């Protein structure tokens, strides 16, 4: 009997509890949706899976305790909201300012609200399907709906999402660890040394930290890492808001001899023109005259308006410091996939639901409403203030953009270190369910093998390292995974499972019609986004020197 199977779940009342008395040791360890596809862990019954579940997630509980198909939930409403918020929050927040820069503020807000509302509706469909289908496992719902192909489809979508998550975390290490090393060692951008090279660093971190952690048979630190990840993202948003009011526009050129931007009203400032990759015309940047004196530049041309920081700049006819409200270009195609990537939490909804104390669909829907709304606010703040800091110069990974104006800044350094620790500890958590699912599909009912355990982890880490080294920018990971697996998990799979498994409603009922429309919208999003992204790859090939 599958430990998470609920034979009688379809008679559970919507507004009443289906759980019994509470038992100790709440389920507090669900990670990021980009961290773990929990369904594959619960579905597996091999020794590794059982060890992972009983030691890594369920504390002192035995797996046998879940043999009761109607086992009681133990996790409070508040902790469930925290767990789901943590499942939603991930590396996708770092790409939202880039999405706003390529859609405009108003269009981005409309799209953000739309994806959030559609995610809530998707959770509603998923919860109802789980009730009617009698299972709290994503792959099992696929199997009940379409047999083996449905199970494989769910497995591939969840695995792709987790591989994309692993790659995005390794990209963050590739981007941010060199900046931390440069800050501590006082190095300039291009010194020719090997140790600030992000490609080397991700290999060293993978071999020295990620692979050893991935060889553990259980990950008991998951709950602590999850809480730390969410805390560091809150800190990240706070620093983004704070830095908006410190960094002037146009962006001054970083003076490496000083190490930070320091503005002095008594110093003469020269305006120089530097190319702006994201716009057709140039952007006005500032240079300190005491360090650089561009030939042929008239000192009188440096006069202009005075910012509160004391930085003078020359007004330009095409002012780059004005926010754009509606933007459409080739990079706009990445907006919806980035947003979809940021809101994926659906593989974790059902495990969190199964552990909710006094659970009901209505209560779990409220948990989802609170969690998604909270993350919506954080996403909007991070995107808006990040965009209003850099405008058209924003990077596809927001933290990396601050390297343009700082080499050593304590708040940013703290954020970078916190994010680096969080993502480094999270990569093994993402790898665990992928390995468990691969083991379940390829080596069913085989005894645990350390050799297989090691080889699967090593191959997955090696493939992700190659991917991160070869792909020049994180936006392609956000874009491709968001347009494919994230769209499948948010739109397509919940809708088709609902249409297939919920039998008591006629196909012409408003609920089924709504699910059908939702499915069509998801297919359009998926095909449209993938087509536009591929066109962008063809006509605007990646610039390898971008990072």
Swiss-Prot record:
Residues listed as glycosylation sites in the UniProt record: 260, 264, 276
Topology with respect to the bilayer: Multi-pass membrane protein
UniProtKB keywords: Amino-acid transport, Cell membrane, Cell projection, Disulfide bond, Glycoprotein, Ion transport, Membrane, Phosphoprotein, Sodium, Sodium transport, Symport, Transmembrane, Transmembrane helix, Transport
Ranges annotated as spanning the membrane: 105-125, 152-172, 196-216, 221-241, 333-353, 370-390, 412-432, 454-474, 477-497, 515-535
GO terms, biological process: L-alanine import across plasma membrane; L-alanine transmembrane transport; L-arginine transmembrane transport; neutral amino acid transport
Cytoplasmic side of membrane: 126-151, 217-220, 354-369, 433-453, 498-514
Any Pfam family the entry gives: Aa_trans
Region span, Disordered: 1-26
Residues bearing the modification Phosphoserine: 49
Protein name: Sodium-coupled neutral amino acid transporter 4
Species: Pongo abelii
Taxonomic placement: Eukaryota, Metazoa, Chordata, Craniata, Vertebrata
